[in-house]
């Protein structure tokens, strides 16, 4: 079935149509809020300063906030404080017996963890917005104009409250999209911010070509390179390692059950776009505060954490590897999978059911997660090095491409599952996912 026909099927399912329109309407609200300025800011002076931040961590953060940071709007903090709080809570579940118990309590326990994540988001937002408000008062544009019109405690309090409230509202939007809409709300908010800034980045690149700062040959090469990166993302995101499963025959009543074979699909990139987003959040939090301060040692930290530098790349790759394994362990438990297989009479040929099977699955998962982490690191880092030396906007970086393609694929898969469940054809053909049998 063609993509247009599959797209039309969305509007033939009332519940799905409602979810899609609900998601789009909340994303529109987000984009409107990304243009409402914070009170007390000299927008002209701020624009002069931010225009010189291209290629720095500030420019990278601005990409994730959908341009809200460069305009210092009510959503300037973006959704990163929420992501940072989520990381902290998930890490604490590994060392805190209380949080570990909550995690095992199912839905009620998860509600409490979510509540603690919200509290953590507010705390991190207060810290980050305080650093930004104090730093803004010391900032002056290249022409000597002050960024803050009336410095003082009234401006600081107003800015802290505005930015914190904006982040809390974005957190609520993301949760509403996840619960009542289509796709992961937090990922879609980041996705929509990047997509919204893409046209401006394209026009900026065209202006560079017009002034001769960027040759046509280099631009064509970059377009080909980005197309290759997108192709690599689509190809790898669909990759699977399939573990063969055989079900033993058994008599249930008067019927002979089982005997059929199946497989357990393990994605090459089980964790999706989460590791790069988490890694970016970890680096952005201190780098953003450092960028808004005038202390030399803080400025050195900000310079070291600029995308494309060796220190940034080392920390970013290390964080990607860590979160690949960590998040995969959070969403996939080989012990539970092996136990469920054993209960239903399933087994991996040549492997004893139970502990041996869980160990076998865990070993395979660890290997493909390693390759998945290498893939994510290459996609995120290599384009940034290329772009750093060609002076192309960061909207064309590897992380942004990965988020755009990855979130698009995840959202399409959710739409697909809704349509197939109601006996409608979806976007993807059967058997499209490739895998290695094992």
Language-model features: where?
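N-terminal cationic and glycine-rich segments that engage phosphates or anionic surfaces
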Residues: 1-103, 108-438
